[in-house]
């Protein structure tokens, strides 16, 4: 049997720089993680970061400090594409909501508006039972 040959090694394509002044920052803060996504007004993703991607594992992903670092990293990547002003959409009940918004402004992005888009069930699925520790 002949030795296996590997295919051509693919180089990672460098993303082309978009020049977008106004964007949207979507902060999804759950009980376990915080994900910050910065998009253009149409909804195409420019940059994103999460608490796990920044380097936190396990229960430390749900801390406000992890959300702060994730928001700073997403803002830094978005500023490379020319984003200067964002409208913030916050979703979820997690602990990193406010700190993520604060760190977006601290990173140099101007926050235009803040909207809470947390979905609420109109008597839909049964919620998880209470924890007994």
Swiss-Prot record:
The keyword Ribosomal protein applies. GO terms for biological process: translation. The keyword RNA-binding applies. GO terms for molecular function: rRNA binding; structural constituent of ribosome. It holds the Pfam family Ribosomal_S11. Residues 1-22 are annotated as: Disordered. Keywords: Ribonucleoprotein, Ribosomal protein, RNA-binding, rRNA-binding. GO terms for cellular component: ribonucleoprotein complex; ribosome. Residues 7-17 have a biased composition (Basic residues). Belongs to the universal ribosomal protein uS11 family. Part of the 30S ribosomal subunit. Interacts with proteins S7 and S18. Binds to IF-3. NCBIfam families: PRK05309.1, uS11_bact. Located on the platform of the 30S subunit, it bridges several disparate RNA helices of the 16S rRNA. Forms part of the Shine-Dalgarno cleft in the 70S ribosome. This is Small ribosomal subunit protein uS11. It comes from Renibacterium salmoninarum (strain ATCC 33209 / DSM 20767 / JCM 11484 / NBRC 15589 / NCIMB 2235). The lineage of its organism: Bacteria, Bacillati, Actinomycetota, Actinomycetes, Micrococcales.
């Amino acid at each position: 049997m002949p030795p296996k040959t590997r295919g051509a090694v693919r180089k990672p394509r460098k993303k082309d720089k978009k020049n977008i002044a106004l964007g949207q920052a979507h902060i999804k803060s759950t009980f376990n993680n915080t994900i910050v996504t910065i998009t253009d007004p149409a909804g195409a993703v420019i940059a994103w970061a999460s608490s796990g991607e920044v380097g936190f594992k396990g229960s430390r992903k749900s801390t406000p400090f992890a959300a702060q670092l994730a928001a700073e990293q997403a803002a830094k990547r978005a500023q490379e594409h020319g984003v200067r002003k964002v409208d913030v959409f916050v979703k979820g009940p997690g602990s990193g909501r406010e700190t993520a918004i604060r760190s977006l402004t601290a990173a140099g992005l101007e926050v235009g508006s803040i909207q809470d888009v947390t979905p609420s069930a109109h008597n839909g699925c049964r919620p998880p039972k209470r924890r007994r520790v």
